[in-house]
Amino acid sequence: MSASSVSRKQLILEIRGKAKISCDLKRHLSPRTVGTIMRSLPLEGHAHLLGKSILYFESNINSGIERSKTEFKKGDVAFLPSAGSLCFFLNDTVFTKTMTLIGKLSENIDALK
């Protein structure tokens, strides 16, 4: 059963053969970006690690910056418009590029490491 609502959409992030992690996209954080991502589902791609703090994968989503941030907490989900990438934060991080916060991983975050 999904706990989704108009302002929050619960998704499953699946790392093939490794883990399934619940992810909440929150429309109130960045309405335009979350709406664009929701219309683009399902998404598939190859995951890449950036240092020890960020797991990301590139997509074909085209959305500008919205409510930009450079500081993120463990479990945050953000969109990097310059690369069209979805980013999952494995640790608290200050990043050099601005991103749009779009949601939160709700469980089993360490399975991404």
Residue spans for each PLM region:
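Glycine-rich active-site loops that engage anionic ligands at enzyme catalytic sites
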Residues: 23-113
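N-terminal intrinsically disordered, low-complexity, charge/repeat-rich segments that act as generic
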Residues: 1-29, 45
